[in-house]
């Protein structure tokens, strides 16, 4: 996963890592780990940054070179994400077990995502979007 856009957008806005860390209520060290790729940014913080910079998640994650953000605000809703994940999986005729195997996780994890009990991990959402050519903004 490439988070080069985190750096580019921060610099475009003439901000320092500590400024973004304060905005997200995290440490500068944590933010630095996201920028250099040592840690993956959680979906809720990714969402906050996309809203702050007024960019799409697809653009932020490098899944698209076009920023097709509609000037609205994204919200993370576990139930909607779960429903869309399930719809996508069924459209592609993929079982929960197959998707779990692809993501190197468990069937129960996929079930928890689809039922809206747990927010999908950024890395899993990214892998699904990249592998199956769907929009992160849709999920």
Regions found by a protein language model. Name each.
Residues 1-12, 68-91:
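A short, Lys/Arg-rich alpha-helix, primarily the initiator
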Residues 5, 16, 42-45, 56, ...:
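Residues that mark the N-terminal boundary/hinge immediately upstream of a DNA-recognition element
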Residues 11, 22, 51, 90, ...:
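Alpha-helical residues within the helix-turn-helix
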Residues 14-32, 36, 93-112:
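Short alpha-helical DNA-recognition segment
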Residues 25, 44-59, 123-138:
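DNA major-groove recognition helix of helix-turn-helix/homeodomain DNA-binding modules
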Residues 59-69, 138-139:
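Short amphipathic recognition helices of helix-turn-helix/homeodomain-type DNA-binding modules
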């Amino acid at each position: 996963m490439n988070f080069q856009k985190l750096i580019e957008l921060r610099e475009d806005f003439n901000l320092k890592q500590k400024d973004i860390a304060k905005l997200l209520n995290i440490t500068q060290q944590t933010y630095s780990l996201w920028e250099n790729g040592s840690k993956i940014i959680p979906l809720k913080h990714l969402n906050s940054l996309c809203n702050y910079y007024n960019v799409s998640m697809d653009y932020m994650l490098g899944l698209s070179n076009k920023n097709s953000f509609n000037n609205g605000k994204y919200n993370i809703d576990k139930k909607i994400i779960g429903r869309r994940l399930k719809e996508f999986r069924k459209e592609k005729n993929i079982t929960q077990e197959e998707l779990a195997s692809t993501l190197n996780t468990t069937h129960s994890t996929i079930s928890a995502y689809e039922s809206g009990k747990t927010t999908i991990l950024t890395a899993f959402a990214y892998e699904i979007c990249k592998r199956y050519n769907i929009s992160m903004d849709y999920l």
